[in-house]
From Swiss-Prot:
Keywords: NAD, Oxidoreductase. One of its GO terms (molecular function) is methylmalonate-semialdehyde dehydrogenase (acylating, NAD) activity. This is Malonate-semialdehyde dehydrogenase. The active site is at C280 (nucleophile). It comes from Pseudomonas aeruginosa (strain ATCC 15692 / DSM 22644 / CIP 104116 / JCM 14847 / LMG 12228 / 1C / PRS 101 / PAO1). The keyword Cell membrane does not apply. The gene is bauC.
Amino acid sequence: MGTLHHLINGEMVADNGRSADVFNPSTGEAIHKVPLADGKTLQKAIDAARAAFPAWRNTPPAKRAQVLYRFKQLLEQNEARISKLISEEHGKTLEDAAGELKRGIENVEYACAAPEILKGEYSRNVGPNIDAWSDFQPIGVVAGITPFNFPAMVPLWMYPLAIACGNTFILKPSERDPSSTLLIAELFHEAGLPKGVLNVVHGDKEAVDGLLQAPEVKAISFVGSTPIAEYIYAEGTKRGKRVQALGGAKNHAVLMPDADLDNAVSALMGAAYGSCGERCMAISVAVCVGDQVADALIAKLVPQIKALKIGAGTSCGLDMGPLVTAAAQAKVTGYIDSGVAQGAELVVDGRGYQVAGHENGFFLGGSLFDRVTPEMTIYKEEIFGPVLCVVRVNSLEEAMQLINDHEYGNGTCIFTRDGEAARLFCDEIEVGMVGVNVPLPVPVAYHSFGGWKRSLFGDLHAYGPDGVRFYTRRKAITQRWPQRASHEASQFAFPSL
């Protein structure tokens, strides 16, 4: 069983201190050890990033874009290799892993437009012989802390754009599935990224706290659970750091009586059970307007849930792999137990699911609850597993109130043929991302990603235009070149045109 390394100042750095096991969730076996950085190791990465910043910030944006474009090409050329690593350590299917990587590459493509997105604004003759302009300048050393569920995509939300903007970066990926993240960072260096511009440090809370406490780190981007997002936001902002912290979710799909039910069912199957439900944009609640809609939905869902193809993620032709860890498997099982105990109707039970030849894997089958109510734990909390809850309401207004009353506000969607209902829903619903006849309203790379309420801590969303704003500071410059042979008297009144 090999041990992974940190990537600091362009070099692989061994660490003989604390470590954690990385598991193959399909077999339950430990396959690697990942080092957990102490303060000394983290400081090496901070020092490397700090030393690299002056030269990188002064590198022309077009030169930065050339490195990013070569990086994009290398990612595409290594898709199969990266996808296999994701699947081995996370458990998601190879097809799902490849899709994750493709969405990440879209963010690299957006970052390749650095010469355009960093142009700033210019105004000539704002006053007599006075010109003014504003531009985007990098912050300095910035950091990202990323979750296990998208080991390729979420880091690619962060550091390509941060680096394109002229910053240097320290990435603390999830210790559960770090190999693909490390390989991708190596490919960035292969593309010509200078040493120290991107550093990868593995770790746990000690490393997180070190980044929060380091005065050299000017901004932190985080994706993960709400309690940790809240902690990172509070600890970072009280030290004067810029922080964007994306937290948990409880995403609802509203099904209207006029919905195309066959298309809605197909959408819900992928959104609820894809990646074993381990997505912050997973649909975990289906809100049916009317009993007739709910009954018809369940009748169509049940056979499809029971027919899900489940197995080792690296096998071909699957719908779903295992959960990421034994702890995750136990937690989701506990939620199913809770739903039964609190009176929800368990229509399909995924507990105890086993895959032949992989009896020690962290598998669950798809589960479906009906007649779930808002006071139940399975409705209130993020399950992060292959569990779909059906809630019955009598009107669109009741469905909207249900969603607006929930503490999370990440994403939601509505299935309807009624344009008036869809427009009302988009206007009045209190979440950050809305889909109309689209199950996973994940924006493309040139729009920003993020929720409302307790799904986001901070003022700016991830990637896209908000990403540029997060990783830069605006500087306004006013210059005057007096005409020759002229002298202007002192002006004591407030200057005006």
